Amino acid sequence: MAEEHNHNHEEENIIWITNEEGKEEAFEILFDFDSEDFDKSYVLYFPAGKSEDEEIEILASSYIQDEEGKQGQLKPVETDEEWDMIEEILATFLADEDEE
């Protein structure tokens, strides 16, 4: 099921996702990237407002952005191969963050 997401350039790292009950929830974007192997764009994000010492669940979706770059559709990750690639990229990202 595709979910709508909005992007406000004043809050560049926040997306708003409408859940199944129709309620909007804020998520912070960890990072996004394009995959040539799967010809898709992906975004990794987590619930906004979590403190640094709380354990967070990082979510991943592929997405299709609208022409203006302000709104789009999140799509579920479809294959194990995509998940493997996302997990590898996330591990590299987290390792790089630890080094800084």
Curated annotation (Swiss-Prot):
Pfam families given in the database record: DUF1292
InterPro entries, per the entry: UPF0473 (IPR009711)
Record PANTHER family: UPF0473 PROTEIN CBO2561/CLC_2432, UPF0473 PROTEIN CBO2561_CLC_2432
Listed HAMAP family: UPF0473 (MF_01448)
Family of the protein in this entry: Belongs to the UPF0473 family.
Protein known as: UPF0473 protein lwe1514
Organism: Listeria welshimeri serovar 6b (strain ATCC 35897 / DSM 20650 / CCUG 15529 / CIP 8149 / NCTC 11857 / SLCC 5334 / V8)
